[in-house]
Amino acid sequence: MSWQQRIDTALATRRAADALRTRRVVEQGAGRWLTVGDSRYCNFSSNDYLGLSQHPAIVRAWQQGAEQYGVGSGGSGHVSGYTRAHYALESELAEWLGYPRALLFISGFAANQAVIAALTGKEDRIVADKLSHASLLEAASFSPAQLRRFAHNDVSQLAALLDKPCDGQQLAVTEGVFSMDGDSAPLAAIAEQVRRAGAWLLVDDAHGIAVTGHKGRGSCQQQEVKPELLVVTFGKGFGVSGAAVLCSEAVATYFEQFARHLIYSTSMPPAQAVALSAALSVIRGEEGDQRRTALAGLIQRFRHGAAALPGRITHSQSAIQPLIVGDNSRALSLAERLRQKGCWVTAIRPPTVPAGTARLRLTLTAAHQPEDIDRLLEVLHESGE
């Protein structure tokens, strides 16, 4: 089979399954409203959970950072791209989350791949929740380490896998809040089994940081767990982009030597780091508390109104509120009907989620108003979902 035949076959298979991914050009895609051409929609597909992407102080911080540093870092942090702005943000994150060190990465995907690739060898074992993010599972599958996956949030199966003989070290991998189901990992129970086995724990808290826990410190603080490796990302609750790995001093120094995504990537623009420091100030302050409280109220408003919907909602208490509809074409059709009614919703289909669980991934943000939630519920009820 030629290269072109291989590509054509793969695309035809996706089209036949109503699983072909496409992108839409939007004029404005973050915040309460999404604009496509001349049409405006209430946006229920954004990960901007606290509504910070449009925050005036954070926007100004980025502008001021660009005026001071320019628009790019100019190189890897190991060469010339590690500025005072990067150092300040790392220091603030480490102090906020109670770790000796924080290391910045250009994305959560890069951070997860770097950590697993740098740490694990052929005698090691990675034990990962089967619903962990693609960045984690891909890195684990590419690693020379043995990969074993446990049933979603099944602590007993995790413990059984950790108990199996291993010539090297073991790394348990999970998320704080899962991106597709919106549910939380039982981190305290997981951490107990990891400690008992003498393993290490990696928690990706992309969807929990800034949104949950005291002063937004995330899922681990909320459940009183301190993993050896905590990955936080900035494209959700922070409203920006990028990521950081929180760890010990020795592990940070190790990553500075062996984490290839850190060493060989141009570091994030310094202006972005300035904006992230401004976002952190909002998140950990009184305004952050107010936004989290507002978001929690909207989540409960939605769940109360969605209880009577025919589609299956999960037990999620997070900003991610999936409506499981099952069939790919049905999910696509429902998403289109909602858009026709002014609600921008995205259908999520396999292979992103398991077969037979196509869904509308509804995301709520602190930028929404109660009337937005009421309108969404009204449209869902009208659509028979």
Curated annotation (Swiss-Prot):
Q: Which residues carry this modification: N6-(pyridoxal phosphate)lysine?
A: 236
Q: In which pathway does it act?
A: Cofactor biosynthesis; biotin biosynthesis
| InterPro entries documented for this protein | Aminotrans_II_pyridoxalP_BS, Aminotransferase_I/II_large, AON_synthase_class-II, AONS_Archaea/Proteobacteria, AONS_Proteobacteria, PyrdxlP-dep_Trfase, PyrdxlP-dep_Trfase_major, PyrdxlP-dep_Trfase_small
One GO biological process this protein is involved in is: biotin biosynthetic process
- Record EC number: 2.3.1.47
Q: Which residues are involved in binding pyridoxal 5'-phosphate?
A: 108-109, 179, 207, 233
What is the designated name of this protein?
8-amino-7-oxononanoate synthase
